[in-house]
């Protein structure tokens, strides 16, 4: 049986709009579990703190100007933390706008009962946009060609499509009009005045954590946005200007403008602002214990050799679950509130740790791979240094590979 095709068939059968495959890619599986007994058979699992998520939102709100709207970025299935599980908190906090990337994510947001503004924060194909028209997504565009394609769709379905026009003032370079060129301003005006396409927002995105760089580029954006609104006859009160991600919103307050787009800060992943703790912990358990004599090798490629007689704990997690192979011989995990060294490279479904100096370890004991246990903590910095990737590359995979258990 082709498992991927089977999953796709399930998604097709469950889609509610025409065409039937509207939300089949990317496929979002509901990994939510509601009782601890449901994670008993899992290789690993995520514990997500709804209380910390709420606290992060409230703390962020306190730093935002009263007139500035918050658009919670929930792309990549809420950074791996699960849109379905977090939307009740978003609704409770009365967040007026949610940003997503895929149609599947947009569908989950709408299914939660959210009736507010829904923005896609990446360029989408015409077919993708067409298949999600009923979800009332405000699309991101940065070229006249996109505007023409959307106008054709709007005429086909007799509706107006709302768009946010991206300018490349931030220097991200992945979408947006470059207003410094001869063609750029003409193209921007053409888009803003195109029939059947309603520009409701003008935006850019800053790629660096550098306040002075942001301020320089913000000045350019403000000038270009003002010129565009005047040249295209756009009413200022009908246009949302937005440029600020998590870092910019907190560290360059003058960039908050009409709306901010916090993502990482809500989930506790903003290196410049550690006062926002992570809402997720990554956990597994001890499967068995093994005594090895001195001189024994551990793991593929025999990268570790015991110097003395040792006791090893076999953990039910590996790189297929999002615990990278590179963690071997570098990382530590928490067992019984103490640190244990990962030895040998992590396998596909197994990781070995040395528990020779930890008393009372038993099969079934809980192991913290990331997060806190008693007075110890495995930090973001540790994970990034040992895995040799940025933290989002880890937790977005954790969320798709492991069940998620939400705690208050």
Curated annotation (Swiss-Prot):
Stored SMART domains: Ala_racemase_C
Organism domain of life: Bacteria
Catalytic activity: an L-alpha-amino acid = a D-alpha-amino acid; L-lysine = D-lysine; L-arginine = D-arginine
Sequence positions that bind substrate: 174, 348
Keywords recorded for this protein, A-Z: Disulfide bond, Isomerase, Periplasm, Pyridoxal phosphate, Signal
Top enzyme category: isomerase
Needed cofactors: pyridoxal 5'-phosphate
Signal peptide range: 1-24
Compartments reported by the entry: Periplasm
InterPro entries: Ala_racemase, Ala_racemase/Decarboxylase_C, Ala_racemase_C, Ala_racemase_N, Ala_racemase_pyridoxalP-BS, PLP-binding_barrel, Racemase_Bsr/Lyr
Residues bearing the modification N6-(pyridoxal phosphate)lysine: 75
A molecular function (GO) term: arginine racemase activity
Disulfide links within the chain: 71-97
E.C. code: 5.1.1.10
Active site location: 75, 300
GO cellular component terms listed in the entry, alphabetical order: cytosol; periplasmic space
HAMAP family per record: Bsr_racemase
The family this protein is said to belong to: Belongs to the alanine racemase family. Bsr subfamily.
Role played: Amino-acid racemase able to utilize a broad range of substrates.
Protein name: Broad specificity amino-acid racemase
Source lineage: Bacteria, Pseudomonadati, Pseudomonadota, Gammaproteobacteria, Vibrionales
């Amino acid at each position: 049986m082709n498992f991927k095709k089977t999953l796709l068939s399930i998604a097709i059968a469950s889609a509610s709009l025409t065409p039937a495959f509207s939300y089949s890619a990317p496929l979002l599986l509901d990994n939510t579990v509601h009782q601890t007994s449901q994670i008993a058979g899992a290789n690993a699992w995520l514990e997500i703190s709804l209380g910390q998520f709420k606290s992060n939102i409230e703390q962020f709100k306190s730093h935002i100007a009263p007139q500035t709207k918050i658009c919670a970025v929930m792309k990549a299935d809420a950074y791996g933390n699960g849109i379905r599980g977090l939307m009740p908190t978003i609704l409770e906090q009365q967040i007026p706008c949610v940003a997503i990337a895929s149609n599947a994510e947009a569908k989950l947001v709408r299914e939660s009962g959210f009736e507010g503004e829904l923005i896609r924060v990446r360029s989408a194909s015409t077919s993708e946009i067409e298949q999600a028209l009923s979800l009332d997504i405000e699309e991101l565009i940065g070229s006249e060609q996109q505007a023409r394609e959307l106008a054709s769709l709007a005429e086909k379905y007799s509706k107006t499509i709302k768009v946010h026009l991206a300018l490349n003032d931030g220097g991200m370079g992945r979408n947006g009009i470059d207003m410094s060129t001869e063609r750029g301003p003409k193209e921007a005006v053409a888009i803003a005045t195109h029939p059947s396409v309603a520009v409701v927002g003008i935006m850019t995105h800053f790629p660096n954590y550098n306040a002075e760089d942001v301020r320089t580029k913000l000045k350019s954006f403000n000038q270009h946005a003002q010129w565009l609104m005047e040249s295209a006859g756009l009413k200022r009160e009908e246009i949302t200007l937005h440029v600020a991600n998590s870092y910019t919103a907190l560290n360059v307050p003058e960039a908050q403008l009409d709306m901010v787009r916090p993502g990482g800060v809500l989930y506790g992943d903003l290196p410049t602002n550690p006062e926002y703790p992570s809402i997720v912990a990554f956990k597994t358990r001890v499967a068995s214990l093994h005594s090895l004599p001195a001189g024994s090798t551990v793991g593929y490629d025999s990268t570790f050799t015991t110097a003395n007689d040792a006791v090893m704990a076999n953990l039910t997690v590996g790189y297929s679950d999002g615990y990278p192979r590179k963690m071997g011989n570098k990382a530590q995990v928490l067992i019984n509130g103490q640190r244990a060294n990962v030895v040998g490279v992590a396998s596909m479904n197994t990781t070995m740790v040395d528990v020779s100096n930890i008393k009372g370890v038993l099969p079934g004991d809980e192991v913290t791979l990331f997060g806190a246990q008693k007075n110890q903590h495995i930090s973001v910095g540790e994970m990034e240094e040992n895995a040799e990737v940025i933290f989002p590359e880890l937790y977005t995979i954790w969320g798709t590979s492991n069940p998620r258990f939400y705690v208050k």
